[in-house]
């Protein structure tokens, strides 16, 4: 079984509990001992986020340390004075410059996994669109003017909306 199938099968098992999965406290290393550690971190982050995001039971994914070298270090740390900082697991370097993992996750979240588009209304049929869960700012332009509303698409909630322009200001 490939690693992807193995991870997904574990998510399936946890998903059977019927509670939302929160993937938290992620630390993917980028230290120099990995060769091009930042490329390793980028590739691992992209693969894992795609798996986690695609699973229906996943509700949240939380990266642990945003910036390298800022994790709390206990005096009796397992690897001297560095503690978790040894792994360089942040999405940003110590100087706040973006690492490749930041760039790939920013692209996934703000571009690939974002729904945007235009729908031309057809009075003769049910008008539909396909998008990710979340909030949608809707702008409707008619001969009578432009109207705005917000629609919420959430898991386990019916997603059929009727928009009455007479009730919008």
Predicted regions and their residues:
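Aromatic-rich peripheral "rim/lid" segments of glycoside hydrolase catalytic domains that contact
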Residues: 2-22, 28-169
């Amino acid at each position: 079984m490939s690693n992807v199938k193995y991870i997904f099968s574990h998510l399936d098992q946890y998903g059977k509990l019927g509670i939302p999965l929160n993937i938290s406290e992620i630390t993917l290393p980028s230290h120099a001992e990995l060769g091009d550690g930042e490329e390793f971190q980028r590739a691992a982050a992209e693969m894992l986020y795609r798996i986690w995001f695609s699973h229906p039971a996943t509700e949240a994914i939380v990266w642990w340390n945003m910036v390298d070298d800022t994790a709390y270090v206990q005096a009796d740390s397992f690897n001297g004075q560095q503690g978790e900082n040894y792994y360089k697991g942040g999405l940003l370097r110590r100087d706040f410059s973006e690492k490749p993992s930041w760039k790939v996750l920013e692209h996934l979240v703000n571009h690939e996994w974002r729904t945007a588009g235009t729908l031309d209304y057809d009075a003769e049929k049910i008008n539909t669109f396909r998008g990710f869960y979340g909030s949608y700012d809707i702008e409707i332009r008619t001969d009578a003017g432009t109207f705005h509303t917000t629609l919420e698409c959430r898991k386990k909630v019916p997603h059929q909306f009727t928009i009455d322009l007479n009730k919008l200001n």
